[in-house]
């Protein structure tokens, strides 16, 4: 049996037209992407969630209840389109953990707390688009207690844009502070064979893979980070 997991990539931002009408965009790697209503609904159902395709369908039905829009695309086609556009990530595996690792390993980590624009965009997404009560959305600005692994991930991710696989290798090497780009390269790519493309494969067998992956997933589910691409 193969498992598949999905998560949203990037962060939400709300723009205004000249006549003051609001429209949402998703920003990934400093590039803005326009989404139609169906795409935005699917992306929103995955923001700070890690879901299977059937779970996406349930969340999508809940979000579209009461909305009056039609789309010629099926939900499956919409999900596939978002994956192709790089706005949704997917991971496959023979177990729940393997699919989670495959999902996370190539994604980059951006702490929401490090960027006030990310945090404010996340607040707007919850309040305006998702319709969450103001009192619930404002909790995004409160600080949660993190585990030691989570604190270390946030500390390193505040110093450099790192993928999950790179964070696993940092944990394996005991790196707690990044003093320079040279130190980072020496830690991550200290031989001729290791590249950013094959590092996720190499780190899958690391003893740090499970605890770091679990910590990253927990940070994401608690709205402390967003996923990025380079």
Predicted regions, residues:
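Short, flexible segments with low predicted structural confidence
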Residues: 13-14, 27-31, 139
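N-terminal leader segment of winged-helix/HTH proteins
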Residues: 1-20, 89-90
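Long, charge-rich, low-complexity alpha-helical segments
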Residues: 33-230
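A short, structured beta-strand/loop element
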Residues: 21-26, 30, 35
């Amino acid at each position: 049996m193969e498992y598949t997991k999905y998560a949203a990539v990037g962060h939400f931002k709300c723009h205004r037209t000249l006549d003051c009408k609001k429209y949402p965009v998703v920003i990934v790697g400093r590039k803005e992407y326009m989404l139609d209503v169906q795409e935005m609904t699917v992306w929103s159902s995955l923001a700070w969630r890690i879901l299977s395709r059937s779970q996406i369908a349930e969340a999508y039905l809940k979000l579209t209840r009461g909305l009056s829009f039609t789309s010629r695309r099926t939900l499956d086609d919409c999900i596939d389109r978002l994956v192709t556009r790089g706005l949704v990530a997917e991971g496959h595996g023979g177990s729940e953990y393997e699919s989670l690792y495959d999902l996370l390993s190539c994604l980059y980590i951006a702490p929401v707390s490090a960027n006030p624009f990310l945090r404010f965009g996340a607040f707007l997404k919850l309040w305006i688009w998702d319709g969450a009560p103001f009192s619930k959305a404002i909790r995004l600005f409160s600080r949660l207690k993190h585990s030691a692994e989570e604190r270390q991930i946030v500390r390193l991710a505040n110093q450099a844009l790192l993928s999950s696989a790179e964070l696993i290798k940092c944990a394996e090497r005991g790196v707690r502070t990044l003093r320079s780009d040279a130190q980072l390269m020496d830690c991550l790519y200290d031989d001729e064979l290791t590249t950013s493309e094959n590092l996720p494969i190499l780190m899958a067998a690391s003893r740090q893979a499970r605890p770091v992956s679990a910590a990253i997933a927990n940070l994401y589910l608690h709205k402390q980070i967003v996923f990025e691409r380079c």
